[in-house]
């Protein structure tokens, strides 16, 4: 509803209250162009209405004929109404004090980090730092993360985060498979590894022919395994000296992975010092809310000789064009967008925002502060152990850092009942054992309450007192950590971890980093296939509510009623949007959703006695995650050609489907295609594959062009993943978090992922767990719930239509200057367009990279470079950008084309021109020695509008070759900046 100007309303008969109530105002906040601007854009395209444009763009054979069936959410809610409704759900959760542990802990998020990172759009709306010159702030924060991991684990090099600890362990397994014993397919897992980790490792192992054996750690050296996974400390709390075992494993030709608790490593000998080849773990307890399981940043660190086999992103140090230190993503040739099925992993989105929070936690506390926290946690555990012993309980693990396991016998249920009465959760180890893990939030009062619980269950009338226990411990020679495992090596010695301990200094450090970067809070980010749309503040607010942020993923079901109702509602919303029958929210990235979907397809074929079906057809234009995921799922990738228009070559598809009919498992297609068009024959593609026994996987990366207009489940798809961090407004966070739900047809619903170890069994024949928590990154799901609730069915459809309108407007305006490579009937595109810069390179020597860097001088993040076609830019404006911002981008692109024309016509030198030397830093522009053939003003202010609003790149063009040849992935000494 559009409100008229109050002055006009006052001159009329008073309206009713109902007429003045506005429920859909959020849609006007979310959708950038107003009605007048949309009409002007439509006129430029030659259409009278948005509906007419959509009729011309989307094939009639796949159009939805009914509104989105959103049920109670069909009508939009105002921001206040949606928040109130979600608050009602949140209030149905019960926030108990959870000592369940098992890899998840309560943590204090320093408020300076909460407000200035997690709640700051300068951080959470940024994209993955593939354009290093405009990403130096978050690259530095991620480099700090890598330095933190390297120091604490004692290994040579760390990546910049993975999805969760369980996934990191699975990645470590496949890493060791690539480099390990050629005659062994056995991966040995100690039986005191976290149960959810064992489950995810098993899920990953089966499709690629790895046999997982689980047993006592002591037997690992005799298992003839290419790799061994140890937990340090173990799930039940034991702190074991694995030095001799690691030597024996190495002597037998195996390698060692250690899943290590990061806080414990501040006081324990790091695994890199006693024989670990790889270390993995979770950084959640470094200031990140537990959030019902996620999102959290995992880590993976390796010995130096394994660095080129690492999965995930890696920040490295290089130099810029002026020879100054600069940061960039290093060794990108390992990644799926380049290596495809030969990549080290299918990981795309990781957990950058959470990694940044964890690194800043270490920066803020420093080594002394972290060690103090660790010693306090260990002391509280020791006090509790002593008190429980005095009450007659037997401690199973005599060594510990923060986790205790007790023999409780017949008192087990009484102990749980007494704890629940005090709103406390303990870990249910077995019918005769109880476990608990303390953390930095555990206070003296909490300890007293726990002692009361143990006393009550024991029938004791006298409760041990904390001060008395403390005196007993102080006078005792007994150590909870074996003296041989006490850490002696220094860590976090770099200056960044030792100078920002006051809030003033920390605040300014965070501001200095965010000022270096371009995020959505500054300008449009027109990245094709990435959907950088508005992440509204009202959507983000609930993320930090305690009722969502402070719930343990394995808390009893009766404490998570509101969470599960919200999740059920969101799943129903996504079912409505996709046209499928069921959705699982467990995958915590799009790559993981792809992987889960392919495992589901395999499970379906196996249930029909056709487990031999393992061929996956993938168009040549597919995103690199598709073949990488297919390879991980144990499938053979067969590439299907595309025709001159960028569509799937139907004749080649028929040929390949017929050729592989006996083994055809699936086809993976993206719709609209990665070429930015709605293929007219998508139904025929689906029918061909079905006729030859395969299933159709529709990649949902481009769902932002389909919501409300068409649905993969209705035009022939059997399974899709979605990217909630694209279509449904979860922010990209500078490279994560993400959520990649997998949506399936009715015949596949029985195969959705379970998680047996936590009791989450939703599907009778479900595949194994694909992430460590039952609902993946649960605490950010309210973002998508809020978006859908505030938009309603009609406005979600309007958003899709506007995204298509914006893309066609940009394509139309830029077509005279840059050829639009692919289009559908009438020269129209879907929600993105590909600009062909290859002819420009031939005529001027200017490359797509030059244009991307020059855009930084104009204050823009570059569109997607050289995907899916080398030498092109793929532009996706989304529905959230206003016409004014679109015109600003168009103006910049046209101005750059004129700069290129000057080179073509000989008015500018082919090497000494503003594109070849872009981006230009302030230091370069004001330097006394200016030797370029173009003016300083041309370098700095190529358009007059930039004078009032100028973004200055902090570094010049990064030297990629130097960075990979001189790989350095730790913090740079301060002297290098001086």
UniProtKB/Swiss-Prot annotation:
Catalytic activity from the UniProt record: N(6)-[(R)-lipoyl]-L-lysyl-[glycine-cleavage complex H protein] + glycine + H(+) = N(6)-[(R)-S(8)-aminomethyldihydrolipoyl]-L-lysyl-[glycine-cleavage complex H protein] + CO2
Alphabetized UniProt keyword annotations: Oxidoreductase, Pyridoxal phosphate
InterPro entries to which the protein is assigned, alphabetical: GcvP, GDC-P_C, GDC-P_N, GDC_P, PyrdxlP-dep_Trfase, PyrdxlP-dep_Trfase_major, PyrdxlP-dep_Trfase_small
This enzyme's EC code(s): 1.4.4.2
Gene Ontology CC terms, in alphabetical order: cytosol; glycine cleavage complex
KW Oxidoreductase (keyword) present: yes
Any single biological process term in GO: glycine decarboxylation via glycine cleavage system
Coiled-coil residues: none
Matches recorded under Gene3D superfamilies: Aspartate Aminotransferase, domain 1, Type I PLP-dependent aspartate aminotransferase-like (Major domain)
Range of residues in the leader sequence: none
Oligomer and partners: The glycine cleavage system is composed of four proteins: P, T, L and H.
Name recorded for this polypeptide: Glycine dehydrogenase (decarboxylating)
The encoding gene: gcvP
């Amino acid at each position: 509803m559009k409100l008229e100007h109050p002055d006009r309303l006052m001159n009329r008969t008073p309206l009713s209250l109902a007429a003045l109530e506005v429920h859909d105002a959020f849609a006007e906040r979310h959708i950038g162009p107003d009605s007048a601007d949309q009409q002007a854009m439509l006129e430029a395209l030659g259409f009278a209405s948005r509906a007419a444009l959509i009729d011309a763009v989307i094939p009639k054979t796949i159009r939805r004929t009914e509104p989105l069936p959103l049920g109670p959410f069909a009508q939009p809610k105002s921001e206040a109404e949606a928040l109130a409704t979600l608050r009602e759900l949140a209030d149905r959760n019960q926030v108990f004090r959870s000592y369940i542990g098992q890899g998840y802990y309560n943590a204090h998020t320093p408020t300076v980090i909460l407000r200035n990172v997690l709640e700051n759009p300068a951080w959470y709306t940024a994209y993955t730092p593939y354009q290093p010159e405009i990403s130096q702030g978050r690259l530095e924060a991620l480099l700090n993360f890598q330095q933190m991991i390297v120091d604490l684990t004692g290994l040579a090099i760390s990546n910049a985060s993975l999805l969760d600890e369980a996934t990191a362990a699975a990645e470590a397994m496949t890493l060791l498979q690539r480099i390990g014993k050629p005659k062994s397919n056995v991966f040995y897992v100690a039986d005191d590894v976290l149960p959810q980790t064992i489950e995810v490792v098993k899920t990953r192992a089966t499709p690629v022919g790895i046999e997982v054996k689980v047993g006592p750690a002591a037997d690992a050296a005799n298992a003839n395994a290419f790799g061994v996974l140890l937990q340090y400390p173990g799930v039940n709390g034991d702190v074991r000296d694995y030095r001799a075992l690691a030597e024996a494993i190495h002597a037998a030709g195996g390698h060692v992975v250690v899943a290590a608790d990061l806080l414990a490593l501040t006081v324990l000998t790091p695994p890199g010092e006693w024989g670990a080849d790889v270390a993995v773990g979770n950084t959640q307890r470094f200031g990140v809310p537990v959030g019902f399981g996620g999102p959290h940043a995992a880590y993976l660190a390796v010995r130096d000789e394994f660095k080129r086999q690492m999965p995930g992103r890696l920040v490295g140090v290089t130099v810029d064009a002026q020879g100054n230190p600069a940061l960039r993503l290093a060794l990108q040739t390992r990644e799926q967008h380049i290596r495809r099925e030969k990549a080290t992993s299918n990981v795309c989105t990781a957990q950058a925002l959470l990694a940044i929070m964890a690194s800043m936690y270490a920066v803020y506390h420093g080594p002394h502060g972290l060690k103090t926290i660790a010693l306090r946690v260990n002391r509280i555990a020791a006090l509790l152990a002593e008190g429980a012993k005095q009450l007659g309980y037997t401690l199973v693990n005599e060594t510990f850092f923060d986790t205790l396991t007790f023999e409780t016998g017949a008192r087990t249920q009484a102990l749980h009942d007494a704890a629940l009465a005090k709103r406390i959760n303990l870990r249910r180890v077995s019918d005769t054992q109880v476990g608990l893990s303390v953390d930095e939030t555990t206070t003296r009062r909490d300890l007293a309450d726990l002692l009361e619980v143990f006393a009550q269950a024991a029938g004791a009338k006298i409760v041990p007192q904390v001060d008395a226990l403390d005196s007993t411990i102080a006078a005792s020679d007994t150590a909870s950590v074996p003296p041989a495992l006490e850490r002696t090596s220094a860590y976090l010695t770099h200056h960044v971890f030792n100078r920002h301990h006051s809030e003033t200094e920390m605040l300014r450090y965070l501001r200095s980093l965010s000022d270096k970067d371009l995020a959505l809070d500054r300008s449009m980010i027109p990245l094709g296939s990435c959907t950088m749309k508005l992440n509204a503040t009202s959507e983000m607010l609930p993320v930090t509510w305690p009722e969502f942020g402070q719930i343990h993923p394995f808390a009893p079901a009766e404490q998570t009623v509101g969470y599960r109702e919200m999740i059920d509602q969101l799943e129903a919303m996504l079912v409505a949007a996709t046209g499928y029958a069921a959705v699982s929210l467990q995958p915590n990235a799009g790559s993981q959703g792809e992987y889960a979907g392919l495992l589901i397809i395999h499970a379906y074929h196996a249930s029909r006695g056709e487990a031999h079906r393992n061929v996956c057809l993938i168009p040549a234009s597919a995103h690199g995650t598709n073949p990488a995921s297919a390879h991980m799922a144990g499938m053979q990738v067969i590439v299907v050609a595309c025709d001159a228009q960028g569509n799937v070559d139907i004749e080649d598809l028929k040929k390949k489907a017929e050729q592989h009919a006996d083994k055809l498992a699936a086809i993976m297609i993206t719709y609209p295609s990665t070429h930015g068009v709605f293929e007219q024959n998508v139904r025929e593609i689906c029918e061909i594959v079905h006729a030859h026994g395969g299933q159709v996987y529709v990649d949902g990366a481009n769902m932002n062009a389909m919501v409300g207009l068409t649905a993969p489940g209705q035009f022939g798809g059997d399974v899709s993943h979605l990217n909630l961090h694209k279509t449904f407004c979860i922010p990209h966070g500078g490279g994560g978090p993400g959520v990649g739900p997998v949506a399936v047809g009715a015949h596949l619903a029985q195969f959705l992922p379970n998680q047996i170890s936590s009791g989450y069994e939703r599907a009778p024949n479900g595949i194994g767990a694909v992430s460590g928590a039952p609902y993946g990154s649960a605490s950010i799901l309210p973002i998508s719930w809020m978006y859908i609730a505030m938009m309603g069915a009609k406005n979600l459809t309007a958003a899709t239509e506007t995204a298509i309108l914006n893309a066609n407007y940009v394509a139309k305006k830029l077509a005279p200057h840059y050829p639009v490579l692919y289009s559908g009937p009438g020269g129209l595109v879907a929600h993105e367009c590909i600009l062909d810069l290859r002819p420009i390179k031939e005529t001027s020597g200017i490359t797509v990279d030059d244009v991307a860097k020059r855009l930084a001088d104009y204050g823009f993040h570059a569109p997607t470079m050289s995907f899916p076609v080398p030498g092109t830019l793929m532009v996706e404006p989304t529905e959230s950008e206003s016409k004014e911002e679109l015109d600003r981008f168009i103006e910049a692109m046209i101005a750059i084309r004129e700069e290129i024309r000057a080179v073509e016509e000989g008015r500018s030198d082919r090497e000494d021109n503003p594109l070849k030397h872009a981006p230009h830093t302030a230091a370069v522009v004001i330097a006394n020695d200016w030797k370029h053939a173009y003016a300083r003003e041309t370098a700095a202010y190529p358009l007059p509008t930039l004078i009032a609003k100028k973004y200055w790149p902090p570094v010049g063009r990064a030297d990629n070759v130097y960075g990979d040849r001189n790989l350095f992935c730790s913090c740079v000494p301060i002297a290098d900046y001086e």
